[in-house]
Amino acid sequence: MANAIIETAKERFAQSHQSLSREYASIRAGRANASLLDRIQVDYYGAPTPLNQLASITVPEARVLLISPFDKSSIKDIERALNASDLGITPANDGSVIRLVIPALTEETRKELAKEVKKVGENAKIAIRNIRRDAMDDAKKQEKAKEITEDELKTLEKDIQKATDDAIKEIDRMTAEKEKELLSG
């Protein structure tokens, strides 16, 4: 039962890391990357649909994304969704494909994005600490219910803390990597 607490916490830590990774992928670093468009939803026949289900997204040049809709009639809907997004990039529609030219980042923009990366990283650490708190509470409940001994509780708390420390180190690594990518341009 004690192992189940740690395994559950580790699974939740991994989910937090995946979520952070997706969040960082959507922060543009001055280079074209199809993952920039992962969170774009297009109103397609009245239903919000992920852009990558309506079009192929390619990177023909370092700072250009090419969006080729599978259904040419959806091009206006895709363009509308891109304009409404918070990307800050104006789409160029030539009737059959949409081009997104990623502007070069200014030094000021890079610093702003680096601040955003730190903030997102801090939020991920808070989530990790909340998971740790839940795991510690579960362990204490088991000890109160006499399912584990006091010594087992102490060992379990140490294991939970070690897993938490490892998860936070991984967040720090991911954050430093993304900041370096942004600031090195």
From Swiss-Prot:
The gene is frr. Its main location: cytoplasm. One of its GO terms (cellular component) is cytoplasm. It is found in: Cytoplasm. GO terms for molecular function: ribosomal large subunit binding. Gene3D superfamilies: 3.30.1360.40, Ribosome-recycling factor. GO terms for biological process: translational termination. Keywords: Cytoplasm, Protein biosynthesis. Belongs to the RRF family. PANTHER family: MITOCHONDRIAL RIBOSOME RECYCLING FACTOR PSEUDO 1, RIBOSOME RECYCLING FACTOR. It comes from Streptococcus pyogenes serotype M18 (strain MGAS8232). The lineage of its organism: Bacteria, Bacillati, Bacillota, Bacilli, Lactobacillales. This is Ribosome-recycling factor. It comes from the Bacteria. Responsible for the release of ribosomes from messenger RNA at the termination of protein biosynthesis. May increase the efficiency of translation by recycling ribosomes from one round of translation to another. InterPro entries: Ribosome_recyc_fac, Ribosome_recyc_fac_dom, RRF_sf.
